[in-house]
Amino acid sequence: MKDEKVYNGKKIKTDKEITNNKEISSDKDMVNNIEDRLWALRNEMDKHNMDMYIVPTCDFHGSEYMGDYFKAREFISGFTGSAGIAVVTKDQALLWTDGRYFVQAADQLPPVYKLMKQGEPDTPTVLEFVRNFANEKDKCIIGFDGKCMSSSLAEKIEKISNVTIVSKYDLIGKIWNNRPDLSCENIWILNEKYAGKSFGDKIKDVRLEMEEKKVDMLLITTLEDVSWLLNLRGNDIKCTPVFLGFIAVTGSQTALYVQRNALSQQVACYLEKNNIDIREYNDIYQDVKSIRKRRIWIDSSTANYQITKLVSKENYLYKAMLPTTKMKAVKNETEIANMKKAHILDGIAMTKFVYWLKNNVGKEKMDEISLGEKLEYFRGMAESYVEPSFEPIVGYNDHGAIVHYSATKETNYQIENKGMVLIDSGGHYLEGTTDITRTISLGKVTDKMRQMYTLVLKGHLHLGNAVFKKGCSGVALDILARKPLWDNGLDFNHGTGHGVGYLLSVHEPPNAIRYRILENQELNPTLKPGMITS
């Protein structure tokens, strides 16, 4: 017998039937589940007199990709893309996402949700929507989980005159009965022959930056920065070899807040040898609360609101991009040499795959999912291969137009010896990270396919062959890729290129190639030698 609760006279399911996606057998089941989840969430909102509850795509560290424990927005909306914010009021459910996911979101969201196409002229931003919503009320109470909300967005909402924020409740956690556990996988050491620079040398550079900015403490909250600084890697996020942790750096101390069960004796000894104080993962909040009369450097765009909220007003918060973010974006000579090796290894795997595909399509059964698995098989032949750098995007014919498409059993196309298949994939090697997209003709193609392929190829070649002046940013170069399309009244609704981490996130700020200038000027940097951009 299923557990049931009643909200406004309606029975709602609360057991694993509505919380475990493995139990979902059809699109109809998903719709019913999402509706039940919204009823349950609104019931929790009523208990705290909330007019609105915001569920961003976020973990405790502002990560782009995250572990299953943190997929609250997916749980409450059914949308599985990597970017988006769900907003739930007493009578509305809305989801904002960017142009990469318009097609996917329209397909996955149940009718009860309204898709808000982020960046479109007639679509308000989340902040604008919240402000307009609040202005219609004398007093507006807005809730969210402060540990899973960026400080920058939360502080903007907080400044709306008639808004009261309630950030201490994880309401999704209240209704997610079979929520996956917080990941706690083994942490491992990245040898200096791959990292190119020791922790000791990196921390010296960090402290020099701290002295220049006249700060007493640096709080590192992003997982990629934590891993990069320590020359450690982990397995807490699929396809991103990082681990859950925070770092606090002062002029004389470095403290790592981490789940101790993730530390082997070897890693613990490594940390001790480097004079790194090991503290419990969740102690960061109490320790931050106890700081007094210090200048603290923090990146409010990635640090969670709960951390910045706990910082006493006796302190001064210096809010800027972390020095580690800028440092790791510019690869050292060892990293560059290794990355070249990684791309050779990846090129070999891709060549073997394309050869196999061309020689076997139409002869043996294959589909979108099996193509991704086959490419993974060829990558796995390299001794230094670690894992995919993201879930492979294999889109046959019209599926190739869905920017971050992920094949499922329900959508999985059979591959035939005609048309085109787009494959966007990458790998993590000890020598670095790759990201490669290829569109492959499998036989007869239409004139339209041929035209689109040619225009995209022209843009790709123009950008790849670009010679540009020192001081250029990605915004200045973006037109080279788009011009052949623009000349024909066409475009693509997403960025052109992005930074790539070294055995870290395949999407690495701040360097990128896009036509939009971002509000945060630190994310519109000058391109520098050593920045690897895909």
Regions found by a protein language model. Give the residues of each.
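Active-site neighborhoods and metal-handling regions in enzymes and metal-associated proteins
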Residues: 2-534
